[in-house]
């Protein structure tokens, strides 16, 4: 198939090209040309054409405000909520989603429905349920609660057996829970190592909700290589992360979208904390 009369951005030169034809073959770009070749054609009438976007920090099943989450919710309802959001993402141009904790493993169920041809949604790369310590950041959100290295190992293996592509853990607190701080680790080093060992045995990796430097350094020692948020990241830790080639998803919107948070019904303390953390968060990512 050829998509004709498209407008594309040349990311090398920064120039906008009009009247471009793009060949799609087996779901991939086969050729870009001023003149289409033989085959089916679909005119875009001068619309912009971009590759599918990838969202790497997604919670399709999340409930706003977080305090309204029902951990005993019927999984069918959870999947329907996730389905609607996945469709919204697809309409916005997002064709791949990495989920990093879903209530009732809604990501895995939705991905299975898509494979069966029952759901038109982006490609979903799921973590299933995240794993948290007792009293930790994931409590009340449908996470798996584990205490000690063996419990974390078993929890990770259970999520992997369910079909997860990666494992999500909360290694620090965050800004969503009243009275919670994020400057100290919530998981210990042995628990981190046990989780990484379980993931490595399945040829995959661990992604960590990680707000501050001490916990990130412990996680790096254990072999965790994907991090979310980094609200308070010092220069030495940022340098180490870069040198070791790990990945950071900064989620800057978490501390810079107060109007959206109020619209979604977040508690005022969450909005206030978000405002307070924003300058440090922005400075951390700039490092």
Each predicted region: which residue ranges?
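Divalent metal-dependent hydrolysis catalytic cores, especially in the metallo-beta-lactamase
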Residues: 81-107, 121-130, 164-177, 205, ...
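Active-site gating/metal-coordination segments in enzymes
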Residues: 135-190
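Short amphipathic alpha-helices and their capping/turn segments at secondary-structure boundaries
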Residues: 39-48, 107-118, 149-164, 233-247, ...
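Histidine-rich, glycine-flanked metal-binding segment
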Residues: 1-2, 8-50
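Active-site mouth loops of central-metabolism enzymes
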Residues: 67-80, 137-155, 205-207
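Histidine-centered divalent metal-coordination motifs
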Residues: 5, 47, 57-61, 209, ...
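Active-site core of metal-dependent hydrolases
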Residues: 176-286
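Metal-associated gating/positioning segment near the N- to mid-region
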Residues: 47-118, 135-137, 190, 222
